[in-house]
Amino acid sequence: MKRKSERRSSWAAAPPCSRRCSSTSPGVKKIRSSTQQDPRRRDPQDDVYLDITDRLCFAILYSRPKSASNVHYFSIDNELEYENFYADFGPLNLAMVYRYCCKINKKLKSITMLRKKIVHFTGSDQRKQANAAFLVGCYMVIYLGRTPEEAYRILIFGETSYIPFRDAAYGSCNFYITLLDCFHAVKKAMQYGFLNFNSFNLDEYEHYEKAENGDLNWIIPDRFIAFCGPHSRARLESGYHQHSPETYIQYFKNHNVTTIIRLNKRMYDAKRFTDAGFDHHDLFFADGSTPTDAIVKEFLDICENAEGAIAVHCKAGLGRTGTLIACYIMKHYRMTAAETIAWVRICRPGSVIGPQQQFLVMKQTNLWLEGDYFRQKLKGQENGQHRAAFSKLLSGVDDISINGVENQDQQEPEPYSDDDEINGVTQGDRLRALKSRRQSKTNAIPLTVILQSSVQSCKTSEPNISGSAGITKRTTRSASRKSSVKSLSISRTKTVLR
């Protein structure tokens, strides 16, 4: 995350907001039009002021605001910035939401600002407008108790609009998530205990999300970690951070992780995790693709029977990893595909890419029904008739269309082979390289050099590991549950968002 000191310029005077939506700065007398027009309609280039509370205001301004004794303007556009992969630009991550909420609360409680209107303003950049509105909306949902719809209605008052968020894939995009999707995700995360800022560990989040410190994020506290794929040995080559299994072992033990699930080709020997006492499972499918029904079922079965938390990785820990964790969330928490994608990206930006988005929409109804049956069975309400009715219900959702995406029967792809990823640069390689490059102290290293290093390491990683095609499951656990290696850099033990 890039953070710059908040600008503290002395701008000339403007009184506080006096209306929900205005095409002029507050306090400036608005000239009434003789024509009978909708007073909420505005020109796209008009300044907009939206009252959040009697003291807090959100503004979209196309010129620099002027300060006054009774108003305090501030902007986070250059302070809390999204670190993009390609054309993606948001939503901002969980740490930035936390920082923003702390900033607002501090300003509202400040003795020197008790008589001032607090105006959070953003400029003409539509991407920054969307992220600023996202932060304001999250604050309304988390701290003001507004429903997602109430927060969204305030932000779109006067026909104000915001561009939707897209994925981190290279090229065009045909699937988007909206501010309302994000607000619903945050609300449900609070409802289900995923989000609790009273115990949020900001330092831990910002430390471990960096490529050099492990590149991991909790998606569901105490249940799911998404992390980048380990290599056979830890090293830094051409600005590209590679971590061995031993980098993660102590952290995983401290946080009750019992199960590791690998979705990409073998770049380390699973024995290095199993000898340390972890269960390890391999569920391979191609980088950038969607999982088969068999893989989804196997993943859910593993997670539902895991004794503790589950750590999931592919190459970058974004596409395949985010997709399968999203399947679990949709099944067990009945969140929509869009809400789930929004939440996973708020926790770990860049997650769920390309066709994986439509795949989740297609699977939504089926996963909800499976979740209903799962919960019914846990309550002891299952019987033969219920099971038969449920099976019939599931068989009827194959051609259901959700948001224009049809759930059609498709031929299962051929089993995935490790060789598919060995000889070329895949999407995961590019995303990992981009993240390593932008977070390294020097950005002077060409991306092609980092990618070349990554591919070479793939070809030489663990050459003696026996290959396997299709879905391979490994569930060995060391009898002694001992580890002969030490963590390279991880020392913190507090769980994020308990």
Swiss-Prot record:
Interacts with FZR1/CDH1. GO terms for molecular function: protein serine/threonine phosphatase activity; protein tyrosine phosphatase activity. Dual-specificity phosphatase involved in DNA damage response. Essential regulator of the G2 DNA damage checkpoint: following DNA damage, translocates to the nucleus and dephosphorylates FZR1/CDH1, a key activator of the anaphase promoting complex/cyclosome (APC/C). Dephosphorylates SIRT2 around early anaphase. Dephosphorylation of FZR1/CDH1 activates the APC/C, leading to the ubiquitination of PLK1, preventing entry into mitosis. Preferentially dephosphorylates proteins modified by proline-directed kinases. The keyword Electron transport does not apply. This is Dual specificity protein phosphatase CDC14B. One of its GO terms (biological process) is cilium assembly. Keywords: DNA damage, DNA repair, Hydrolase, Nucleus, Protein phosphatase. It comes from the Eukaryota. It is found in: Nucleus, Nucleolus; Nucleus, Nucleoplasm. One of its GO terms (cellular component) is cytosol. It is an enzyme of class 3 (hydrolase). Residues 474-484 have a biased composition (Basic residues). Residues 213-379 are annotated as: B. It catalyses: O-phospho-L-tyrosyl-[protein] + H2O = L-tyrosyl-[protein] + phosphate; O-phospho-L-seryl-[protein] + H2O = L-seryl-[protein] + phosphate; O-phospho-L-threonyl-[protein] + H2O = L-threonyl-[protein] + phosphate. It comes from Homo sapiens. Residues 459-469 have a biased composition (Polar residues). Residues 199-212 are annotated as: Linker. Its EC number is 3.1.3.16, 3.1.3.48.
